[in-house]
Amino acid sequence: MSSKRKVELCDSLLTWMQTFQVSGPCSSYEDLTGGVAIAQVLNRIDPSWFNEAWLVRVKKDTTENWRLKVSNLKRILQSVLEYYQDVLGHPVSDDHIPDVALIGEFSNDTELRKMVQLVLGCAISCDKKEEHIQQIMTLGESVQQAVMESIQELLSKAPSDAVTSESFINYDSQSRKYYFLSEDNDEKNEILQRCHDLEQQVSLLMEEKKNMMGENRTLKEQQEQSGMGTPQLFNKKLLLLQSQIEQLQEENYRLESSRDDYRQRCQELDRDVQELQQRNQDLTGLAHESQALRDEMDVLRHSSDRVGKLESLVDSYKKKLEDLGDLRRQVKLLEERNTMYMQRTFQLEEDLHKANASRGQVESLSRQVQELHKKHSTESLRAEKWQFEFQTLKEKFEALQKERERLIAERDSLRETNDELRCSHLQQTCLGQADLLLSGSSPPLENLAAEIVPAELRETVIRLQQENKMLCAQEASYHERLCDLQNFLEESNRSKNRLESESRLQQQQIKGLKAQVEELQKQLREQGNRAEDSSQLKRKLEEHLEMLHDAHSELQKKREYIETLEPKADLNMSRKVDELQQILHQKEEDMRAMEERYKRYVDKARTVIKSLDPKQQNYIPPEIQALKNQLQEKDTRIRHLETDYEKTKVQRDQEEKLIISAWYNMGMALHQKSTDEKTQPPNGAQSFLAQQRLATNARRGQISRSHTLLPRYTDKRQSLS
């Protein structure tokens, strides 16, 4: 049978059990393992056999104790087997007898299904079997089919209904077999009662034999008295009496044989009772002994688990002890450094009083720094504004310069045409005067000269004269505007130079103030750390030592944590370095852009100056020279700052690494020392609790000896910084 089919049969039998609607839990097979629901169902099936007195003996609270479950199931199984034997008249085969120990302890579904099958067999074979069969017919088809299969499986291996001597012997052996499984004395009383009943039957049969013998004597006497009658009647009576005597003798023989059998049976039962009593006593002793052994076994199992855990812990401790050799040497080095750091402690305590007085100065300097930052931001905004205006004016200036060049070219062309016209006009006037002198009549000659000059030329000359006047006026206005623009450009350059010088001075002041603030803060931190009283130092040291003691159980994790801590510090420092480098690159790009703008402005100013005054080509204005000097100073300062930044970066990395290694080396050394003191007791081999006490005392001594390590560490950190 497949496992799936078995599960379906179990579910169907559970559904059939739920139709009785008992008060006990019957929702799952786990609820049936206690036996309460099965006992209530049997009480519903046959209340006369499974009565209330029997039901009371079934323990109900068995959820936490599997032995009570097994006891209930044994009692129920014994009663069911007796019901099959005595009431139904046929015993149960060994294949259908469940193992109650597996049901109670492990909730075995297969054995529990056998138990429910026996209950089903009681239901379909009792006096109320029609009602139970009708109740089964009301269930679903799948449930009915599963119940019928269970019934067929139960009846397929059942013996015949006839009660033979073999079945009685088999039942007797089975009853003795299951009697050993029971721990109750009621079964023994039932067997004794049965023996008593058999003895009463034997006594009744003996009395009946005596009565028959008395009747036989009376019949013989009657025969002797009636011997005087007729021979035929006498013969008939004699035959009748002989037949009765034979029957009585046979009955007597049969009763005597049955009496002997019963006597022998009774003797055997007495011997069995004595043996069973003796065995019961032995089994009770064995049961108590087995219970004690089970308790001891549970204790030993618990202790074995604990021993395994302790062995693993000891192995881990051994591995940790192997890694603690370096820490001892580091603790010695730290103790040597502590003596050197203690000398500096007194000096730093004296400096603390001086630093307290400088806190007000630090606060005022920080406020000045904030004000200077605000001024710097406003000045930078003004510089950007002036720069934008300068750019617009520069574009306008370039446009005006182009327009000026175009006008100059047009002016030159107009000058040439004007010169030509003047020459032609002078030539005509000379010719006219010569003709006038020759002819002596000037008015006609003038009219002739006027007629010789074409009208278009006259119009062109007039127009050119007007344009010349306009261009002269426009040139004068452009010249004035150019002077204004040059003045404005010079003024903007002066303001720009002034703002740059102010910004540079402010930056220098800010850097100086920042350096002073950092120096004062560093002094305050150092002196504040030295000013802590001994109680705070002791408390901090105790906290650190407690942390080290906690790390005693997981040293490997701490080592991994140390390895992961150093990359974190490096990562933070690298992140800070990257940010500073980005800021530096951004400032360098800004400086380059400003330098390029300055160069462009200077080149344009140079071209303008050359175009305005071509004679002064080799002259360099002082503003341009000042800008060049400022750019050179900025380049040198940037290079100095870059070199200082690289030096401080390398120094900071070394300081962080030294601080981390010194701190964790100190912790590991303390831990190594405490573990060595625990693993090497002075008085030889001791118990585990004694070793723990020694370890605690050693740890307390280590705390008192390690109070000086923290000042050493802080002095080392300050010296490195």
Swiss-Prot record:
Keywords: Coiled coil, Cytoplasm, Cytoskeleton, Microtubule, Protein transport, Transport. SUPFAM superfamilies: Hook domain. Pfam families: HOOK, HOOK_N. Residues 696-721 are annotated as: Disordered. Residues 181-425, 484-659 form a coiled coil. Residues 7-123 form the Calponin-homology (CH) domain. Its main location: cytoplasm. It comes from the Eukaryota. InterPro entries: CH_dom, CH_dom_sf, Hook_C, HOOK_N. It is found in: Cytoplasm, Cytoskeleton, Microtubule organizing center, Centrosome; Cytoplasm; Cytoplasm, Cytoskeleton. PROSITE patterns: CH (PS50021). One of its GO terms (molecular function) is microtubule binding. GO terms for cellular component: centrosome; cytoplasm; FHF complex; microtubule. One of its GO terms (biological process) is lysosome organization. Interacts with microtubules. May function to promote vesicle trafficking and/or fusion. May contribute to the establishment and maintenance of centrosome function. Belongs to the hook family. This is Protein Hook homolog 2. The gene is hook2.
